[in-house]
Design a protein with these regions (language model features):
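Sec-dependent bacterial lipoprotein signal peptides
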Residues: 1-20
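N-terminal targeting sequences that direct proteins away from the cytosol to non-cytosolic compartments
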Residues: 19-99, 125-151
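Short, surface-exposed beta-strand/loop micro-motifs that present aromatic residues
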Residues: 92, 108-118
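Short, surface-exposed polybasic-and-hydrophobic patches located at secondary-structure transitions
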Residues: 95-110
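Short hydrophobic/glycine-rich mini-motifs in sensory/regulatory modules
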Residues: 120-122
């Protein structure tokens, strides 16, 4: 009887420990996404001391460029600054001249800045506390017709 009781207790412990295993796996995925964003071509490159100065120079340069390059993003056409692309891995703006990622992101979900085309919602987000990024973001917002929906 005692042996069966111990077996049941151990089985219950094993079943309940799956939750903690899943939490660890989710935490690893989240930390990988954060690290990927802080690489040179990610949107969080400005947070990395190694790239910070170069990213700010790239932002100043891109702010002076016209917003006239048409690119495909998740089935729609967007207009972005020339000599930039949307990074396929992080969905952030990437400067082709320097290779630095900018804190300007695109998504296929609704953000505060969104645009609906044929029933699909596209979002734009940018760090408006960094000098130059707000300028670039406003230009992209205006060129593509994104609408601010948050209050």
């Amino acid at each position: 009887m005692m042996r069966r009781l111990m077996t049941i207790v151990i089985m219950l412990l094993m079943l309940s420990s799956c939750y903690y295993f899943n939490q660890v796996v989710d935490d690893i995925r989240d930390s990988n996404a954060v690290e990927r964003g802080r690489k040179k071509d990610g949107g969080g490159a400005y947070k990395n001391d190694k790239y910070k100065e170069g990213v700010y120079k790239a932002i100043d340069d891109i702010a002076k460029r016209p917003v006239n390059k048409k690119v495909q993003f998740e089935g729609t056409e967007l207009i972005i600054p020339e000599n930039t692309v949307i990074n396929n891995d992080t969905w952030t703006l990437l400067d082709l001249k320097t290779g630095y990622g900018l804190p300007i992101g695109f998504s296929n979900e609704g953000e505060c800045l969104k645009k609906t085309i044929k029933g699909k919602v596209y979002g734009l987000s940018y760090n408006d506390y960094i000098s130059g990024v707000k300028e670039i973001g406003k230009k992209i917002e205006k060129a593509n017709g994104f609408i601010y929906t948050c209050k």
